[in-house]
């Protein structure tokens, strides 16, 4: 049968059916979703229209995440999927999609911070210097060992899981959303 992106199968406004006057075409082709899971890296190549390639990530465990306020990007491990505005099912099954909120390992960012500023993030003696550079909400996450981040790439299409560390108003927004979900 095949997945088709046509509109010939749709009904009219009145509820009647349109007469089907042609077969499915290759250019109307659709494919099943990749539903990229959290696990050891497994990426497949898919030939698309025009001979282009899409990289269908079936499993991913790491990606490039950038820390916007410090202007630094590091490859880090994705630990868990914690929130998805689209569906709770995607959180339960740990599916990586664009705009999913995940927790990432903060170790690469800690190492960069130490080499760049010469101060450790959790050092109590240098707390005044760190406080001016890193907000308190982010420091709490660094000490807990889990940074909240948002996926900005499309793992099912480009085969990568890249994103950015949540900060400021956006971090507060998603924290409120997750707290609300926990209470319900």
From Swiss-Prot:
Keywords: Ribonucleoprotein, Ribosomal protein. It comes from Theileria annulata. Gene3D superfamilies: 3.10.290.70. The lineage of its organism: Eukaryota, Sar, Alveolata, Apicomplexa, Aconoidasida. It comes from the Eukaryota. One of its GO terms (molecular function) is structural constituent of ribosome. GO terms for cellular component: ribonucleoprotein complex; ribosome. Belongs to the eukaryotic ribosomal protein eS8 family. InterPro entries: Ribosomal_eS8 (IPR001047), Ribosomal_eS8_CS (IPR018283), Ribosomal_Se8/biogenesis_NSA2 (IPR022309). Residues 7-23 have a biased composition (Basic residues). Residues 1-23 are annotated as: Disordered. This is Small ribosomal subunit protein eS8. PANTHER family: 40S RIBOSOMAL PROTEIN S8. GO terms for biological process: translation. Pfam families: Ribosomal_S8e.
């Amino acid at each position: 049968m095949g997945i088709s992106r046509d509109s010939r199968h749709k009904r009219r406004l009145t509820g009647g059916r349109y007469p089907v006057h042609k077969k499915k075409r290759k250019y109307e082709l659709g494919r099943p979703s990749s539903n990229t899971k959290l696990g050891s890296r497994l990426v497949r190549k898919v030939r698309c229209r025009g001979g282009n390639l899409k990289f269908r990530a079936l499993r991913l465990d790491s990606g490039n995440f950038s820390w916007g306020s410090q202007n630094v990007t590091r490859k880090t491990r994705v630990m868990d999927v914690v929130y998805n505005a689209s569906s709770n099912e995607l959180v339960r099954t740990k599916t990586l999609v664009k705009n999913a909120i995940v927790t990432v390992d903060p170790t690469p960012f800690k190492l960069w911070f130490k080499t760049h500023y010469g101060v450790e993030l959790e050092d109590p003696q240098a707390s005044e210097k760190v406080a001016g550079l890193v907000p308190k909400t982010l420091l709490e996450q660094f000490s807990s060992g889990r940074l909240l981040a948002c996926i900005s790439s499309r793992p099912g299409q480009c085969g990568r899981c890249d994103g950015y560390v949540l900060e400021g108003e956006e971090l507060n927004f998603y924290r409120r959303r997750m707290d609300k979900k926990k209470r319900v």
